[in-house]
Amino acid sequence: MLFGHEPHDLKPGQNVLVWGASGGLGSFAIQLINTAGANAIGVISDEDKRDFVMDLGAKGVINRKDFNCWGRLPEVGTDAYAEWFAEVRRFGKAIWDITGKGVNVDMVFEHPGEATFPVSTFGVTRGGMVVICAGTSGYNCTFDVRHMWSHQKRLQGSHFAHLKQAAAANKLMLDRRLDPCMSEVFPWEDLPVAHMKMLQNEHKPGNMAVLVQAPTTGLRTLDDVLEASRRR
């Protein structure tokens, strides 16, 4: 999402807004942004996630529960739209508190979709990019297209990575420059427990994993797997 969409490849010094910064996607995004020499602004939903995101290297954190501008865009020209617009501007000022007055984000790392898309498309800077890979809050994304054409913004879909990008990400992991932020690992028989935690939003910050034919955790290479299997 952050690389491969020329000319909007992430560059040192740029600012990126990351939705769901304490989750699986967001925690990786913040670390990748750091490796590129750019600045991550993480958005969280609970204050107890702030330290986790800051420890990942975010330049700043915003709690979305401090604002009321989520969901589908109200009809343009209505009182509801005016209220939404005022709240979005307040959210933008919270970003400026981190980036500096008048400095909007160059890129938005978007995956909630319906709940956040109107804010993403408004908040990204002139000539910037909103890149989206999912719609975890819904697929009916709305936005005020006037801000799109008048400020020449870009909407970009992203679906995983090509082989070279995947290999580069794996190398960062093997070199321990990326932390998988593995909060919980479940044996295969506890797969339903993991699913229920996701459904009820009870999972810890970071990522969960389930062992699939793996004898134990911490196996980084094929040789590690073979050695662990021989010990069983």
Go through each PLM region and give its residues.
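Adenosine-nucleotide cofactor-binding segment
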Residues: 35-115
